[in-house]
Amino acid sequence: MKTIGFIGLGLIGGSIAKAIRKYHEDYRLLAYDQDRETLAAAVSSNMIDAVCEEHDERFRSCDYIFLCAPVEFNVKYLEYFKDNIGPDTILTDVGSVKGIIHKEVERLRMESRFIGGHPMAGSEKTGFEASSDRLIENAYYITVSYTHLRAHETEADL
């Protein structure tokens, strides 16, 4: 059984989590979001299994962690996760720009644990309530990784 963590359950994070839940009911899904109402809705709909705090030990158990907050927040989470995730955990983001986050990945020497991602999907609506397991269905998911390192080997799993 895989464990997948989410930082942010807005339109994209919520849609990815809903799609994973739909196709992999046995996966364990953990999530943190600044909006407590979003987390309550995710739990009540059985989309996530556990609500996490921003800096939560349970993220150590994740096989993958999706950074689905705004880019500037995703960059900040890298610093925390550098020393607070399992040795084989892969981090990925869904931000539309990669320069800032890739510079931070390199500065923190996390290249073997990070795959930049960008789902080519969206909506004029925002937030968890607009998310759907169908939003990313048949959408391209662009990945950008460091080809000489371990993260590249796991892209196919995503």
Show the residue positions of the predicted features.
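NAD(P)+-binding Rossmann beta1-loop-alpha1 motif at the extreme N-terminus of oxidoreductases
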Residues: 1-54
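Receiver (REC) domain switch-region micro-motif
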Residues: 4, 65, 91
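Rossmann-like NAD(P)-binding element
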Residues: 57-82
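Glycine-rich, N-terminal phosphate-binding loop of Rossmann-like dinucleotide-binding domains
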Residues: 69, 95, 145
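Rossmann-like NAD(P)(H) cofactor-binding subdomain of soluble oxidoreductases
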Residues: 80-129
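Acidic/polar active-site rim loop that often engages polyanionic ligands
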Residues: 133-142
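Conserved small/polar residues in nucleotide/adenosyl-binding loops
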Residues: 147-154
